[in-house]
């Protein structure tokens, strides 16, 4: 997703958090809306560090993240389990750490929500906060003078803080590209020059002279390729880097703002150790040598082991959470309402008749869900994977190489699809079609066809469909064709190349596009599509705010109007079709019904909370998500 999508989504999460409140049990509002509660009532971490407080007690610092964003830093006493939450001391707007560092002076630093922040565990307090240019650090390091450096997404912002003097320098955005940049590594040589490596559309390594603010490239334009560059600080005082991380050889020695090609990495180029990392940072070792064996935020359990004695100690801790945001909602063949959350990655099953929840750690992020026959299918991020779940059998969890797992791993489609936006369960009962945007730094997404009878896949690339486009929405037509709606958005960190989105018709048998056209001028995304059996027309939303009606026979728009924004998620599910063929629309703040003759959007109700993900029908109700909560709406009689 591009920067505009991310910024809007982070703001929206903050609004949803305020509307939903905490982990509310099932409750009804005015007889129409029911809040069924939180799908996954726990948080995930965005960095964990084992360290000590001012009394030399072992403590654990955990950045807590739920559907609101990174809302607090949790401090756990490793001996007693006693915990304390320190609310994030600035308006984070749904953002979260993507990098943190514990300095040599035992201070925890991060940079997110356009704020650089320091936490001092000896004082048990946030001790420095400074607003910066947007937005969040993708890498952080410490130089030989104890200065903390950060490099931020999406426009290569560089910031530095000297804890000894209190001086903070925001160098601003120091490198421009027309795509969102991920500076995933940063290093400083012993001469004080700062080097940072970016990706994904075109890798690069740049150097900053902190004395003058000068920024200069370390590799030629001809050496820049799709992927992520890499730099690290060595114990010999120099920095080493690669134009593309992981390549054999091709190393550069970087020193005093110059680059020298050295081929293989020199034997004396040993990485200098820092307690730093991405959002997955998990530093397990305490200063006294004890180690974290387990930290489980779902079970609220901490296990610490002593390698010297082999003994371990288990303590329970607690914290507040509003739960992970729901990515997808659909009705399963067993009559339950199911979907997935992120973050953390959990699958949920809700039985409305018994008012009972089941929750399972799941494989990846469930962007798109759909049922076909007696199975429930999942299209997920990362890798554009496809899962098959039998809800009538015991849940075992997913292992890629286990054909008996439930859910069962079927296949994946990276790099052509990395982040799914549509999973079409075709009415033929055997075909599944997955669509979405491609891998990081790529432009143009494919289509994955899965044949359940033969258990085989066909993967089309964007060049087989529409070059530089990705498919955002799909609907099956009765003549053996698919109508697809594209997005011009590239894969995360990629470059947008198509000028406007298009509709296309694809013949399923031949897998060939037989027609395409940018039918609505200037549109960047066809958010969702729905076929109405009553009139043979297709309803759609373009850029979330333009409702249109398309005639697949004449290939023309027969109606269009501007509306309030429709509900939105990576797999939107804006339209909900009832068994009697009535078609409903989920807007962010209301629910409407489409008149099949006049195409009027008849308002049914204003929603008490924002709708963040659709949407399915069960027993006279429409189920949808608002942040971390599952809601439903009782449909009035026609």
Predicted regions and their residues:
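Surface loop/turn motifs at the tips and blade-to-blade linkers of beta-strand repeat domains
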Residues: 35-43, 87-92, 129-133, 172-178, ...
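Repeated scaffold domains used in trafficking and secretory/extracellular systems
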Residues: 41-51, 93-101, 134-142, 179-186, ...
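Conserved beta-propeller blade signature
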Residues: 59-63, 107-110, 147-150, 194-197, ...
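Short, conserved, GDST-rich strand-edge loop motifs in beta-rich repeat architectures
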Residues: 65, 434-444, 484-500
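Residue-level signature of beta-propeller blades and closely related beta-rich strand-turn architectures
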Residues: 65-66, 114, 154, 200-201, ...
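A short loop-to-beta-strand structural motif that recurs across blades of beta-propeller domains
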Residues: 72-74, 115-117, 157-159, 204-206, ...
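Short loop/turn segments that connect beta-strands within beta-propeller blades
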Residues: 78-81, 120-124, 162-166, 209-213, ...
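Blade-level signature of beta-propeller repeat domains, shared across WD40, Kelch, NHL, RCC1
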Residues: 609-638
């Amino acid at each position: 997703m591009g920067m505009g999508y991310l910024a809007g989504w982070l703001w929206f999460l903050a609004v949803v958090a305020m509307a939903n409140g905490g982990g509310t049990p099932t409750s009804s509002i005015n007889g129409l809306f029911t809040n069924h509660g939180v799908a996954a009532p726990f948080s995930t971490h965005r960095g964990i560090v084992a360290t000590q407080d001012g009394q030399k007690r072992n403590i654990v610092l955990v950045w807590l993240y739920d559907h609101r964003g990174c809302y607090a830093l949790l401090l756990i006493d490793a001996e007693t389990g006693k915990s304390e939450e320190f609310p994030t001391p600035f308006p984070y707007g749904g953002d979260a750490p993507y990098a943190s560092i514990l300095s040599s002076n035992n201070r925890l630093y991060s940079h997110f929500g356009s704020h650089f922040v320091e936490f001092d565990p000896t004082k048990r307090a946030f001790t420095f906060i400074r607003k910066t240019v947007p937005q969040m650090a993708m890498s952080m390091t410490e130089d030989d003078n104890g200065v903390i450096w950060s490099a931020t997404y999406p426009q290569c912002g560089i910031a530095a803080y000297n804890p000894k003097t209190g001086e903070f320098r925001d160098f601003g955005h120091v490198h421009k590209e027309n795509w969102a940049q991920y500076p995933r590594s940063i290093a400083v040589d012993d001469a004080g020059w700062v080097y940072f490596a970016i990706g994904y559309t075109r890798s690069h390594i740049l150097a900053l002279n902190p004395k003058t603010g000068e920024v200069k490239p370390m590799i030629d334009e001809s050496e820049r390729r799709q992927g992520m560059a890499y730099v690290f600080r060595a114990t010999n005082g120099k920095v080493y880097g690669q134009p593309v991380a992981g390549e054999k050889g091709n190393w550069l020695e970087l020193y005093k703002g110059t680059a020298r090609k050295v081929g293989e990495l020199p034997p004396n180029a040993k990485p200098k150790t820092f307690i730093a990392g991405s959002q997955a940072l998990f530093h397990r070792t305490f200063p006294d040598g004890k180690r974290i064996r387990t930290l489980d935020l779902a079970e609220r359990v901490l296990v610490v082991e002593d390698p010297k004695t082999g003994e371990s100690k288990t303590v329970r801790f607690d914290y507040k959470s509003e739960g992970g945001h729901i990515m997808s909602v659909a009705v399963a063949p067993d009559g339950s309402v199911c979907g997935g959350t992120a973050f953390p990655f959990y699958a949920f099953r809700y039985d409305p008749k018994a008012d009972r929840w089941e929750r399972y750690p799941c494989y990846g992020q469930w962007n798109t869900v759909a049922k076909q026959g007696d199975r429930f299918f999942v299209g997920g991020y990362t890798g554009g994977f496809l899962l098959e779940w039998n809800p009538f059998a015991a849940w075992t969890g997913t292992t890629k190489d286990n054909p008996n797992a439930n859910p069962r791993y079927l296949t994946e489609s990276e790099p052509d699809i990395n982040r799914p936006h549509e999973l079409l369960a075709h009415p033929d009962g055997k075909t599944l079609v997955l669509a979405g945007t491609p891998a990081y730094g790529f432009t143009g997404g494919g289509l994955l066809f899965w044949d359940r009878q033969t258990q085989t896949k066909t993967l089309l690339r964007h060049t087989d469909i529409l070059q530089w486009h990705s498919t955002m929405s799909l609907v099956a037509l009765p003549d053996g064709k698919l109508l697809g709606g594209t997005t011009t958005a590239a894969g995360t960190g990629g470059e947008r190349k198509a000028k406007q989105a298009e509709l296309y018709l694809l013949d399923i048998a031949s897998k060939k596009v037989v027609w395409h056209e940018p039918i609505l001028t200037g549109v960047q995304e066809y958010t969702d599509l729905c076929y109405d059996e009553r009139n043979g027309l297709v309803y759609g939303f373009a850029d979330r705010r333009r409702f249109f009606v398309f005639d697949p026979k004449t290939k023309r728009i027969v109606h269009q109007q501007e509306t309030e924004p429709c509900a939105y998620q990576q797999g939107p599910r804006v339209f909900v079709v009832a068994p009697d063929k009535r078609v409903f629309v989920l807007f962010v703040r209301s629910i409407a019904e489409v008149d099949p003759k006049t195409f009027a959007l008849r308002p049914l109700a204003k929603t008490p909370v924002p709708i963040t993900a659709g949407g399915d029908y069960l027993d006279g109700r429409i189920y949808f998500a608002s942040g971390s909560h599952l809601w439903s709406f009782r449909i009035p009689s026609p």
